[in-house]
């Protein structure tokens, strides 16, 4: 359980992140459920609660006070309770309402992926996909209640729907409508029966001031539609009222706004004081209409009253507790009400909130009052709220008035500085030079994405129109461009990548110092500040001619050279800073950092004077400023934080990363934190002074080892210390008296005397110090310090004892030394290995490949070797690889397992590829138990480690000076696997693994029996052979050496029959055929008889003159090795390497009987179907070996079966070459049918007559029927 606990990061509750617990639980749930499945329910609950940070655990413990033992709760119930306490409490209806309010403001405030993920998470969290039509109707119904008069009804109906959801009740739109009607009726009835309290009984908040108003009301005069103040906006834009959230008008013309709604009826009447601004707080009267706004704070919805004049945001204590009671900080400044009285607050806390769908972080102040005020500290963070506030602010502060006055004055007096367009510095030019040995580099243009092509074209045209760049046709230097999107505007900026082209490395540095933050802040002393921003600052400085030749960019439109200084040039910042420093030299209260210029003064008059002098310089140098980015006469400005009359303070946006930073856990994180903290400490007033008293001296404890070492170095033990402490030590002082007075008793009475009497002849007293021989007896109080001195340099026990026996002595000195060394951390951490324990070898498995040991060897010449050793047989598999990743390892093991099967257990070390999730998943899927050895202790996996050593030495011997390859590895493996192993009782690993001896080159030395044993066919082979022959109508075929044949020759995917000659035979079915000038090995099925040359012809096995010229069905005697005809039959083996040249005695007898059959016999063994011979046209005479025809004209039988079908050769029962008188003269022709009749009556009209054109199958069937 401790291992699981260490693998889980502790959860710390943060009110600003209500979804943090949900994400933490989802990330670690499998660890609790699957990895902790063997734990009991109580142990799992302990593990879960143990992973909570201390303050988070106490919060949970406080919420479960009614339960005596929180660990007795089940794991699932504990998860439910934790989710309820630390999870988001927003209801499903509220989540659905907020889901449709998500927006990406201005398209810039949120990353693309974050915005997409937020939409996906919101849709899943609100369960929109599971909503029925009734739920959608109710949802849209409630969403449409947005008018101010429907706020209470909407809140009531949402509570009604949520209560129904908890009860699992299915609501319809009609039910919500009925409940709405009930609420309206109750609301109207409550107005009728309610009694309006008197004016004096009304309670007024502290920050509200009641004013006297005229109670007499007049009927409002209908006003005409006034022209909106926003008519200058773009056409087509629909105005939105900030006050009532309706579209079609602005807040200044809103009828619901009491400041504007009854203007027609209040003309000429004096208005009471509606708001008073004191220290930034807006104080409103009781009768003023209030506008409320709901804001999501820390994942919970909070209703605020909008206060556009308040500089801070306030919440009540009850609301603060609802948010989870985030820790409060002390308020660093004074807060007062409108009447000047101070306002008491509990403190402030940093929270996260959402405005218009965008999340922000800012302080909120907690007070005892019930009203929550939404001030400008939050509103100004949202761009939409800032623009809306500009419409309803009805009072302008003094600073804003002065800022407007100064801006108008400067624009009137210096129109050239505020003029549109790009300025040009007339006093200075930028000069850049390269090193003398610099080699120009011309880089090609980078492709521009099609989506950005239009924007890049527009920017290049703008720069060309402004005179910044001009096209050229030739340049030695050229750099590609980089397109950057500007923050806030969405426009792009085209910059040159001079680093890529090598120009920055070749340019000489500009040695002008840049001002530090201390230099800038030292000049900013005052109460009034202005901030000036130059328009396209760098582009206002012109380059000289030599620099223009260097600043060249290569674009998709060609090459351009810069006429003005651009971003990306290495000396540009220093060069521009030099020009700006020269321009503002002599001006007090002006600080410049590149293009940011800050002016400070103690009064508005002095500030105005400095501004005039500065703008005179702008006019003289030709610089122009951007009026939109300038700020005049401000109380504070933002520059590396906030700068105001009180000094500088950090910006909360910039310090968010530091506030949310976790406690440092290593040196690098600590250095980063200290650097940031040191920078922020400079913004603290009097940070160099200590807040509390600091102790500079302490009294060290005698029991502290570290303190003793300090004392030891400062004050080593001396003779004086020994003498002084000996007098106070009871044992030493007693012995000193005995020695001085020589008062030893024959029979000691005390324990001290009994112990020291044995040393009385060796004891002596010198200058008040007791010695044993030449060793000083150290008192009890100094023994520990002396031990420290003896252990200086950290000697071992033996050396320390030898050293001590030369100087000191006391009772138990040896045991103290031993304990000192054993408890010294430095000595133990750097000690030798302890004595080994008895060997505990792995048990031998019962069968091979049950347990395997794996490891990696290498690298050897850039390659690694995966070693797999069987624990039973020592059989090894080695795979050569260049990668040792988990994926590669699994692939190699799967290849090995496909040969030997899956083992039961795998033993390996703790390599990352062997302890990865993928490897564990592979073992689990195959039912393999994976065990790992101890870390950095290879002996636990000794089988693999020993073989790795054998493998390395063996490969090194084989390869010599060469590199490792598969051929060398195979040589080693065949040698190792067939070498007797001592652990296998002299057997080889291969013999034990496979159960047989494998054949090697050494097997050639052993004599073998030359008698060839013909293996018999198995029953399965016989059945397969029988069905194959029956299905394909197999027939025996034989060819002789030097016989002319047709052989099938393949060319790619095509084949062709060509002339060939049999030159050699291999076994029973393979022949070597000469085709032209080359030899080809062919199967008997790829050869056909070639007729026309009768010197060598195909011989039917049943009519062969040699009874051994064919192979019988069941084998037989061995064929002679001469050039006799080689015949294959249905019974021939298909093994091409074993040429079957054997025939059976049965076939011999049958052949002899056929050849010796008497003429005219009609025995069933005779076959009267005779195959006609084919005589050559050059020999018209009748060949005795062929049947005699009636006509001497040579006739060829019509080939109806194709060239690939062999004509059946049959016998009439008489030997070939018989005369016509022996066969009979009754052969006549009748159309295409031939009828054979002989002189023997028994042969006339028999069933063996041949029918011309008859198919092979029909003829064979007819013959088979005759035989039956």
From Swiss-Prot:
User: SMART domains attached here?
Assistant: ZnF_C2HC
* Organism field: Caenorhabditis elegans
Name the record gives this protein: Uncharacterized protein K02A2.6
Q: Tell me the Gene Ontology biological-process terms attached to this UniProt entry.
A: DNA integration
One GO cellular component, as annotated? cytoplasm
| Pfam families (alphabetical) | Asp_protease_2 (PF13650), DUF7083 (PF23309), Integrase_H2C2 (PF17921), rve (PF00665), RVT_1 (PF00078)
- Residue ranges annotated for the Integrase catalytic domain, each copy included: 844-997
Q: Give the boundaries of each CCHC-type zinc finger.
A: 239-256
Q: Where is the composition biased (Low complexity)?
A: 191-206, 1208-1221
Q: Does the keyword Repeat apply?
A: no
Write out the coiled-coil annotation as residue ranges: none
């Amino acid at each position: 359980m401790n291992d699981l606990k260490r693998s889980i990061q502790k959860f710390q509750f943060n009110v600003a992140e209500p979804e943090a617990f949900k994400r933490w639980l989802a990330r670690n749930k499998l660890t609790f459920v699957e990895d902790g499945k063997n734990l009991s329910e109580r142990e799992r609950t302990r593990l879960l609660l143990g992973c909570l940070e201390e303050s988070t655990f106490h919060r949970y413990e406080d919420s479960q006070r009614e339960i005596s033992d929180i660990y007795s709760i089940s794991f699932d119930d504990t998860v439910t309770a934790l989710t309820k306490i630390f999870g988001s409490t927003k209801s499903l209806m509220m989540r659905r309402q907020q889901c449709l309010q998500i927006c990406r403001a201005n398209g810039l405030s949120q990353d693309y992926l974050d915005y997409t993920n937020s939409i996906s998470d919101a849709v899943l969290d609100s369960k929109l996909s599971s909503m029925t039509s009734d739920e959608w109707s109710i949802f849209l119904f409630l969403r449409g209640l947005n008018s101010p008069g429907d706020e209470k009804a909407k809140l009531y109906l949402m509570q009604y729907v949520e209560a129904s959801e908890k009860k699992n009740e299915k609501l319809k739109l009609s039910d919500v409508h009925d409940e709405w009607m009930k609420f309206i009726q109750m609301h109207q009835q409550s107005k009728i029966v309610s009694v309006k309290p008197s004016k004096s009984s009304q309670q007024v908040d502290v920050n509200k001031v009641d004013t006297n108003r005229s109670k007499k009301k007049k009927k409002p005069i209908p006003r005409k539609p006034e022209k909106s103040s926003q008519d200058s906006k773009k056409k087509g834009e629909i105005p939105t009222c900030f006050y009532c959230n309706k579209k079609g008008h602005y807040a200044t013309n809103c009828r619901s706004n009491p400041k504007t709604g009854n203007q027609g009826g209040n003309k000429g009447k004096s208005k009471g004081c509606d708001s008073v601004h004191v220290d930034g707080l807006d104080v409103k009267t009781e009768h003023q209409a209030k506008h409320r706004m709901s804001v999501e704070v820390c994942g919970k919805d909070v209703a605020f009253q909008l206060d556009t004049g308040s500089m801070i945001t306030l919440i009540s204590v009850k609301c603060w507790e609802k948010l989870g009671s985030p820790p409060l900080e002390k308020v660093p400044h004074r807060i007062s009400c409108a009447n000047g009285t101070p306002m008491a607050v509990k403190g402030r806390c940093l929270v996260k909130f959402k405005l218009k769908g965008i999340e922000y972080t800012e302080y909120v102040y907690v007070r005892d009052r019930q009203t929550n005020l939404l001030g400008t500290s939050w509103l100004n963070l949202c761009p939409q709220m800032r623009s809306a506030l500009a419409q309803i602010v009805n009072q302008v502060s003094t600073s804003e008035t002065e800022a407007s006055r100064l801006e108008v004055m400067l624009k009137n007096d210096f129109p050239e500085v505020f003029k549109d367009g790009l300025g040009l510095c007339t006093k200075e030019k930028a000069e850049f030079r390269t090193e003398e040995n610099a080699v120009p580099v011309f880089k090609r243009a980078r492709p521009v994405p099609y989506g950005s092509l239009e924007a890049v074209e527009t920017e290049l045209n703008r720069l060309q129109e402004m005179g910044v760049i001009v096209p050229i046709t030739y340049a030695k230097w050229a750099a590609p461009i980089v397109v950057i999107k500007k923050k806030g505007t969405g426009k792009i900026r085209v910059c040159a990548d001079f680093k890529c082209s090598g120009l920055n490395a070749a340019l000489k540095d500009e040695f002008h110092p840049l001002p530090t933050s201390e230099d800038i802040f030292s000049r900013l002393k005052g109460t009034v500040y202005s901030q000036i921003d130059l328009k396209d600052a760098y582009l206002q400085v012109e380059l000289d001619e030599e620099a223009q030749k260097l600043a060249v960019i290569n674009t998709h439109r060609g090459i351009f050279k810069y006429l003005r200084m651009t971003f990306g040039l290495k000396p540009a910042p220093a060069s521009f800073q030099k020009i700006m420093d020269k321009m503002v030299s002599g001006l007090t209260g002006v600080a410049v950092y590149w293009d940011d210029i800050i002016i400070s003064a103690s009064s508005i008059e002095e500030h105005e004077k400095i501004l005039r002098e500065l703008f005179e310089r702008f006019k003289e140098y030709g610089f122009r400023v951007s009026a939109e980015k300038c700020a005049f006469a401000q109380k504070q400005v933002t520059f590396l934080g906030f700068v105001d009359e009180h000094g500088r303070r950090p910006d909360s946006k910039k310090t968010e990363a530091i506030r949310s930073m976790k406690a440092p856990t290593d040196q690098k994180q600590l250095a980063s934190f200290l650097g940031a903290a040191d920078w922020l400490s400079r913004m603290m007033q009097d940070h160099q002074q200590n807040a509390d008293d600091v102790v500079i001296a302490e009294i060290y404890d005698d029991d502290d080892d570290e303190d003793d070492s300090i004392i030891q170095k400062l004050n080593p033990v001396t003779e004086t210390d020994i003498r002084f402490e000996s007098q106070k030590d009871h044992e030493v002082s007693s012995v000193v008296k005995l020695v001085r007075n020589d008062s030893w008793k024959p029979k000691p009475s005390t324990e001290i005397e009994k112990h020291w009497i044995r040393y009385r002849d060796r004891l002596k007293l010198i200058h008040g110090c007791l010695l044993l021989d030449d060793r000083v007896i150290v008192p009890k109080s100094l023994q520990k310090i002396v031990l420290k001195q003896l252990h200086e340099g950290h000697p071992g026990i033996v050396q320390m004892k030898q050293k001590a026996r030369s100087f000191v002595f006391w009772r138990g000195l040896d045991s103290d030394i031993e304990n000192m060394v054993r408890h010294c951390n430095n000595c133990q951490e750097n000690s030798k290995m302890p004595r080994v324990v008895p060997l505990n070898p792995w048990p031998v498995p019962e069968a091979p490949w049950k347990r395997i040991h794996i490891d990696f060897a290498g690298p050897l010449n850039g390659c690694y070797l995966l070693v797999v050793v069987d624990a039973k047989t020592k059989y090894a598999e080695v795979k050569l690889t260049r990668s040792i990743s988990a994926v590669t390892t699994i692939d190699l093991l799967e290849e090995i397992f496909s040969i030997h099967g899956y083992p039961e257990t795998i033993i390996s070390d703790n390599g990352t590829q062997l302890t990865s999730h993928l490897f564990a998943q592979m073992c689990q899927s195959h039912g393999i138990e994976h065990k790992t050895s101890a870390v950095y202790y290879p002996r636990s996996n000794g089988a693999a480690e020993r073989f790795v050593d054998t493998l390395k030495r063996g490969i090194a011997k084989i390869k010599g000076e060469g590199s490792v390859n598969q051929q060398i590895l195979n040589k080693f493996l065949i040698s190792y696997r067939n070498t007797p192993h001592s652990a296998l009782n002299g057997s080889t690993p291969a013999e034990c693994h496979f159960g047989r001896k494998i054949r090697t080159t050494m097997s050639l030395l052993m004599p073998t029996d030359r008698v060839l044993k013909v293996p018999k066919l198995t029953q399965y082979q016989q059945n397969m052979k029988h069905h194959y022959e029956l299905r394909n109508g197999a027939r025996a075929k034989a060819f002789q050496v030097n016989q002319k044949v047709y052989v099938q020759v393949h060319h790619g995917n095509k084949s062709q029959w060509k002339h060939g000659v049999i030159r050699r035979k291999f076994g029973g079915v393979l022949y070597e055929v000469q085709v032209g000038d080359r030899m080809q090995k062919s199967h008997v099925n790829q050869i056909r008889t070639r007729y026309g040359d009768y010197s060598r012809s195909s011989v039917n096995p049943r009519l062969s003159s040699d009874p051994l010229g064919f192979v019988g069905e069941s084998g037989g005697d061995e064929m002679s090795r001469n050039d006799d005809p080689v015949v294959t039959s249905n019974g021939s083996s298909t093994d091409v390497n074993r040429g079957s040249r054997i025939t059976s005695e049965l076939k011999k007898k049958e052949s002899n009987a056929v050849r010796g059959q008497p003429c005219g016999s009609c025995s069933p063994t005779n076959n009267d179907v005779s195959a006609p011979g084919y005589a050559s046209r050059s020999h018209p005479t009748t060949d005795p070996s062929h049947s005699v025809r009636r006509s001497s004209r040579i006739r060829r039988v019509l080939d109806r079966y194709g060239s690939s079908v062999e004509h059946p050769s049959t016998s009439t029962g008489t030997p070939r070459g018989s005369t016509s008188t022996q066969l009979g003269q009754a052969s006549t022709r009748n159309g295409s049918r031939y009828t054979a009749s002989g002189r023997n009556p028994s042969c006339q009209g028999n069933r063996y007559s041949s029918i011309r054109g008859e198919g092979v199958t029909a003829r064979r069937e007819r013959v088979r029927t005759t035989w039956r």
